[in-house]
């Protein structure tokens, strides 16, 4: 099954008349991962569902299919819509479990585990501070199963918070969303002014296509085909042994989507072994504002290209524009010289990016009255 990414906001810091702040949905074979949920997220989510119903018959984004909410960091343009959305799902009597994940600092983890106040050095935008505040504002009264897990990504150290007490217990590792058997969610450390990480959804390698032509040549029955397709060997009545591996091509390579969140260009932890099929990377500033990008640990479009090369991405999509960037085309124009063969697209609100099993990427551009598809040839 393909990975279908819905980008519901491409503005940075605050909404504009044409752009909302961050919030994306990544739909894969196991369910939906929500990456960030800025101001007004639940309204934008509901509108996208209505768009699908009207313009993409048969495609859905059911809230009951959301298994995980993962924050890239704690700045409010990435988090401020989360608690209202969670409370709305509770009012709608949600029963499905939800995993909530986010990065924090070692100092915050230590304080939570020791049941002591957070140190002054822990910034207001740290997710540890926010979550404790959310618990006091009703987050501790949600009635559906929910796990609150914070981690020091660089140290791979994770704790689960108790919303009733504010305490926590250490975990052996970062948990995966419940029911995910065909995909994995992974944090990728980034470089920002508060604890941060990107999130990568990777679909596992899948079996190659079933060789129908060979099955036709052998005159196999429907039952025999089904057995071989399931990986079961068959002993035929004439004594012939048919091995399932003879009817499958080689495994298809895993495909993946990495959403960076806010970050400076080329985080030190990024390595080309990560190799996402698609990187969705922030592009907050214009090239002329490089000093400002460095100061606030953000990126330009050209910086995003450098990040894509550092992490071994096959395709790059830009998002998270400052209000000085009136058109996403501006970002693309500024980075066209340095892209040098890397497939790139500039996103707008409500666009979709579909990563197929074989690694092709389609940019579905929202026009206001449906989506138009642009095929992107991966750089592989």
Predicted regions located by residue number:
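A conserved acidic, glycine/proline-rich C-terminal tail/linker
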Residues: 318, 322-328
């Amino acid at each position: 099954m393909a990975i279908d990414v819905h980008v519901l906001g491409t503005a940075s810091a605050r909404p504009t008349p044409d752009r909302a702040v961050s919030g994306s949905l990544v739909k894969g074979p196991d369910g939906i991962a929500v990456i960030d949920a800025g101001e007004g997220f639940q309204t934008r989510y509901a509108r996208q569902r209505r768009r699908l119903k009207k313009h993409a018959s048969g495609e859905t984004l059911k809230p009951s299919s959301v298994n995980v909410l993962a924050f890239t960091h704690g700045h409010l343009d990435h988090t401020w819509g989360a608690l209202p959305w969670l409370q709305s799902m509770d009012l709608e009597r949600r029963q499905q479990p939800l995993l909530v994940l986010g990065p924090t600092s070692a100092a915050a983890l230590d304080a939570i585990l020791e049941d002591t106040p957070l140190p002054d050095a822990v910034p207001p935008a740290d997710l540890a501070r926010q979550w404790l505040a959310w618990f006091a504002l009703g987050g501790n009264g949600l009635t559906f199963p929910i796990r609150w897990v914070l981690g020091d990504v660089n140290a791979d150290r994770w704790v689960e918070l108790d919303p009733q007490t504010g305490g926590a217990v250490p975990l052996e590792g970062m948990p995966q969303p419940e029911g995910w058997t065909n995909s994995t969610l992974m944090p990728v450390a980034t470089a920002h002014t508060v604890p941060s990480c990107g999130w990568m959804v990777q679909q596992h390698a899948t079996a190659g296509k079933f060789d129908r032509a060979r099955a036709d040549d052998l005159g196999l029955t429907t039952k025999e085909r089904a057995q071989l397709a399931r990986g079961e060997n068959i002993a035929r009545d004439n004594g012939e042994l048919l091995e399932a591996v003879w009817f499958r091509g080689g495994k298809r390579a895993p495909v993946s989507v990495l959403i960076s969140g806010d970050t400076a260009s080329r985080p030190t932890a990024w390595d080309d072994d990560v190799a996402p099929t698609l990187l969705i990377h922030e592009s907050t500033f214009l090239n002329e504002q490089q000093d400002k990008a460095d100061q606030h640990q953000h990126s330009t479009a050209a910086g995003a290209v450098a990040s894509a090369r550092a992490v071994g991405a096959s395709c790059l999509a830009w998002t998270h524009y400052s209000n000085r960037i009136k058109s996403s085309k501006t970002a693309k124009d500024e980075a066209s010289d340095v892209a040098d063969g890397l497939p790139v697209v500039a996103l707008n609100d409500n666009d979709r990016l579909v990563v197929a099993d074989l690694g092709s990427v389609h940019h579905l551009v929202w026009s206001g009255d449906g989506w138009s598809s642009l095929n992107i040839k991966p750089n592989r």
